[in-house]
């Protein structure tokens, strides 16, 4: 599913400004896509306002769209808060329950679980809590750890680790968005999680 909920002024070094589009535009945009070629998977990235989140959730429900991969973009790589405070509750109550998979990074998983994450055990605990609370598979991305880039998946109460080597680069903006998009593409092709 292709759609734009906002215009973002950013580069490989960070996000500089955000301009939201109106929820009515988002809803009409989703109608255009769903009524033309029904998508085999949906990936949702950054949405910053409750009214836009509600519009997206309404259309996903109306069209019974699945699978949904939700990258709950709340905190940038540089640590800036991207999701408005009042939108977190709406994201949790309306979008997360519709997702087949949520892919928070560590700071986002801390917000969703309400607990600090400083080690692998806490990553697992957060993944289990988020998965259980919202009824979705959860992949906590560990790239924000300084020593490794290991990710943990909680699906149906089971834990699976994916081990990765940290790449020393200053140009890593958007890696989580790329991962969630790749997962959505795999699901669209019929691959299982």
Task: Label the predicted regions.
Residues 33-97, 101:
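Glycine/small-residue-rich loop that forms an oxyanion/phosphate-binding "nest" at active or ligand-binding sites
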Residues 9-24, 80:
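N-terminal beta-loop-helix "entrance" segment that forms/cooperates
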Residues 110-111, 169-192:
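Short, small-residue alpha-helix embedded
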Residues 85-159:
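Conserved phosphate/ATP/ADP-binding segment of small-molecule kinases
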Residues 28-38, 128-133:
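A short, N-terminal amphipathic alpha-helix
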Residues 1-2, 6-7:
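Short, small-residue-biased leader/transition segments that mark boundaries at the very start
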Residues 8, 48, 74-76, 108, ...:
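Glycine-rich beta-alpha junction loops
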Residues 156-168:
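Glycine/charged-rich beta-loop-alpha catalytic/anionic-binding loops adjacent to active sites
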């Amino acid at each position: 599913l292709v759609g734009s909920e906002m215009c973002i002024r950013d580069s490989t070094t960070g996000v500089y400004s955000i301009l939201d589009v109106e929820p009515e535009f988002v809803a009409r945009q989703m109608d255009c896509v769903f009524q033309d070629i029904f998508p085999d998977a949906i990936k949702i990235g950054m949405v910053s306002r409750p009214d836009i989140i509600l519009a997206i959730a309404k259309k996903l429900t109306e069209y019974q769209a699945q699978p949904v991969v939700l990258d709950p973009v709340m905190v940038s790589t540089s640590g800036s808060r991207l999701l408005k405070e009042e939108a977190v509750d709406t994201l949790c109550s309306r979008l997360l329950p519709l997702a087949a998979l949520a892919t928070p990074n560590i700071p986002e998983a801390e917000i969703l679980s309400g607990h600090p994450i400083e080690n692998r055990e806490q990553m697992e605990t957060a993944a289990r809590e988020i998965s259980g609370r919202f009824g979705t598979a959860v992949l906590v991305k560990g790239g924000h750890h300084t020593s490794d880039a290991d990710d943990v998946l909680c699906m149906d109460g089971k834990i699976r680790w994916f081990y990765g080597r940290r790449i020393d680069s200053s140009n890593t903006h958007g890696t989580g968005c790329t991962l969630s998009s790749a997962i959505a593409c795999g699901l669209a092709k019929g691959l299982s999680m």
